[in-house]
Design a protein with these regions (language model features):
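Signature of Asx- and small-polar-rich beta-strand/turn repeats characteristic
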Residues: 1-403
């Protein structure tokens, strides 16, 4: 005799009652003691508890696939990736900082030969937060690198109203965060499509530059020039299928503040940046290759080998890394809502390189020692990583925002 099973019971009480009815109907001679203290009732209730738990987890798993009801951040992030939406991490605050130095007099103005240059990446701090400059600060120029006037010249007078020196103040943009460099030796096992490299920090703000240099025995980090060498550099793109990047040219000025001089370049060495569910930054490199060494083993015409290589080597998603190289990743960490600090807070100089090329070494050192800094404006724009509700709304309205 076929047995009818009711599949609509989902909670403990319903499953328990269904099991009792099932036993009464099909096994009345084997078991008929439904007292709460009986062994048979214990077995029935154990099965009812298992059924209740299975129903609960089935509902929870289905709930995590629905954008309106998902509770786990990993589930919402997974749906965001499915829809091609990149969820950002923490945001860094920005502010304006006044860098001041004292330079000697020359005639009726200051001696420009003692005007220093502060290299990019100068670090200042206050309230436990560190900020960095993104460009060189040239005190001999009245303009920023972008051509915006930003220098103030203040004469310093003695008791007889004679000018004894000048204070030069340059107003520059500083961004919260600290630059770090991570290195990794590329081995043969790393030469594979879509290699993933996860950075060790969970508060990565941005990737400054990525280069792969020949050799595996580096004892020092590359210089700024090495990091921006176009032959060794790997470029960040929105998607691996994007093969054209814009490279700014800081040596040229624009008469329009909304236009940045530069050039577009087609590149094969590219990567994308994503964030894991735990907030760590992950770099994913390309999946193609330009290696035709396997074809060269055959005794065929060299030009024919190259033509065959053009067909079988697909670089549409970028190149894979090459072995026996060292990968250097320059990136910035920091950010968060607590980096929004008040004015006149950034008064400490942490790490700064000041170049003064005046004729007198003692005066050069005096100029270097005179560097001071403060922020006349509060730091704004810092934000924590998006919450689950923020990500949910970003995913929900992602398609409508593209119309």
């Amino acid at each position: 005799m076929s047995k009818k099973i009711n599949y609509f019971s989902r909670n403990f009480a319903d499953v328990r009652q269904e099991l009792i009815s099932f036993v009464k109907q099909y096994y009345p001679a084997i078991f008929n003691d439904f007292n709460d203290a009986s062994v048979g009732m214990m077995l029935l209730e154990l099965n009812a508890a298992v059924g209740d738990m299975l129903s609960f987890h089935t509902d929870r798993m289905f709930q995590e696939t629905q954008i309106d009801f998902a509770q786990e951040k990993s589930s919402v992030l997974s749906m965001a990736r499915t829809f091609g939406l990149k969820i950002p991490g923490k945001r860094a605050s920005v502010t304006i900082a006044d860098f001041s130095v004292v330079v000697p007099v020359l005639g009726d103005t200051f001696d420009v030969s003692y005007a220093p240059i502060v290299t990019r990446g100068a670090q200042i701090s206050g309230a436990g937060k560190v900020f960095e400059t993104s460009e060189d600060i040239d005190f001999s120029s009245p303009f920023t690198v972008g051509g915006v006037p930003n220098r103030l010249v203040i004469p310093n007078l003695d008791n007889n109203n004679n000018i004894i020196n000048y204070t030069l103040t340059k107003r520059e943009l500083v961004i919260n965060g600290v630059t770090k460099i991570q290195s990794r030796i590329v081995t043969d096992s790393d030469v594979k499509p879509f290699l993933e490299v996860i950075l060790p920090d969970d508060n990565v703000l941005s990737i400054n530059s990525v280069v792969a240099l020949e050799g595996t025995d580096f004892t020092t980090n590359p210089s700024n020039a090495d990091f921006f060498n176009e032959d060794d550099r790997w470029y960040e793109v929105e998607a691996l299928a994007d093969d054209i990047v814009f490279i700014p040219d800081n040596t040229k000025l624009s008469d329009n503040a909304t236009i940045k001089p530069g050039k577009f370049k087609r590149v094969n060495q590219r990567f994308i940046k994503e964030f894991t569910d735990n907030g760590f930054c992950k770099l994913i490199f390309g999946g193609g290759t330009e290696d035709i060494s396997s074809l060269c083993d055959f005794d065929v015409n060299k030009s024919l080998v190259n033509r065959i290589g053009d067909f079988i080597n697909n670089n549409s998603l970028g190149l894979t890394l090459s072995p026996n190289k060292t990968l250097f990743i320059s990136y910035r960490v920091g950010g968060g809502a607590d980096t929004n600090i008040g004015p006149n807070t950034l008064t400490s100089i942490n790490n700064i390189i000041v170049n003064v090329n005046g004729p007198n070494a003692t005066t050069n050192q005096q100029v270097i020692n005179s560097v001071t800094v403060t922020n006349p404006l509060p730091a704004l724009g810092g934000k924590n990583e998006p919450s689950v509700e923020e990500i949910r709304n970003l995913v929900r309205y992602n398609f409508s925002s593209q119309e």
